[in-house]
Amino acid sequence: MATLPNPLPKLAADPSGTSLGLELPAGSLIDTTAEGPADEPLLWCAGETARPGAWAALRAARSTGLLPVLLDVDGGHGGPRDWELSPYELSYPGDHDADEVLGELWEAYASEDDEWPGLAEPLTLVADPDARAAEVADSLADGGSWLKDPRLALVPARRSADIPAAIGWIGAANHESDTGLLCAVLRSWEDRFGIRVVALAYDRLVLSVAAPPTTPEEAEEIAAEHFAFCPDNITQGHHGTLHAYAVHEVLDQRVWSFWWD
């Protein structure tokens, strides 16, 4: 996929990131993929569990082309070195249309009687997307979340929505093996709902939401997109219907979490 120049190789000789204007804690560069070592590092990952405030402390990294994300290294499948990252097998998110991607997934998983309703309308931001992402990251790092041992990572990517594809994450492979298609949807959600990719585990994706739906109708429209994106959220979740899922997991929610079996 097309990316900006990768600044991560500079950290091999400068682990603290001083040359990039950063003050990084101890960490490591990861280049492990399912196909063998990558030509350049895919990400930098901190060596210690993330604490509240760690995300905001690396705000300056954005100006270097590095974007933050929390990675769970203790979710039963190890950390990113064990995830069979496959960056060379994925398409570029910008080559796809979110409506077409979701429409095809909807037709594959929804009832034959249910037509794809199309994309929900954009909503009004109630928070700065990057500030909301920092808030959600702090809450995830404060314990009691889906993440067992979250580590702050930095990824060379054009936008937050591209992070999963940029590192070659394939946690949704049982649903859709080309993460580039899913990142096309994330780009659309970034534009319409102010999402940011805040955390990744082996088979889980957590987003912050700066423009959440505030009416049941808006929530149900977005819930349809969630079903196409991740049917397991509904079919294997705590809510047996799309309506119940919309009310409890989408309406007024500042966090969207997706899990694939």
Feature-to-residue mapping (PLM):
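Short glycine-/aliphatic-rich beta-strand segments at the starts of folded cytosolic domains
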Residues: 158-175
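Alpha-helical oligomerization segments
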Residues: 180-184, 188-192, 197-261
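Extended, low-hydrophobicity segments enriched in charged/polar residues
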Residues: 2-163
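Short linear motifs at secondary-structure transitions and domain/linker junctions
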Residues: 43-48, 125-130, 171-174, 180-186, ...
